[in-house]
């Protein structure tokens, strides 16, 4: 997924037509941005600051370089991108495009819909009862495709790029969980060592680079 620098990708995404926007853009260099509950906005962009989209707000693309993104329940947004920060998404949120970060975690709560890919470099990914039209990718993060989630693309754990992968000692083995009644339609490709847990009720595409460990309970075994 990360074929061009994310800062450049962020600029590209914010230049695209906004998926849900019918209001004014908000563009800052320093400072946080809040999209107020129930209101409509265009694209939201800042360099140094977090972005908060309150419940049932509608926005275009949302992007920051240094800051986290929080989207509250029932909101509708375009693409979500940050470089240094996590992305936390509430319940019943519709995301028109993808969700990406370099250094930070991504979590999508129940009833979410992501219209594109979900990707991190250094950070975990967690989905609960969420539909993803694209795929999932990470380099060093854990991934949980939680109960009832449906990923129409694949799942890929990429080999670290030598430009940003400096390790001392043995690297941590990542944990990948495909939970109860979850579906990953596309291939699961692992370019580095992982522990892959797949629930007995889950369905996946072909698996390359790892051996699935089956589990039957509500939660995967602890390592």
Predicted regions and their residues:
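Intrinsically disordered, low-complexity terminal regions
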Residues: 1-223
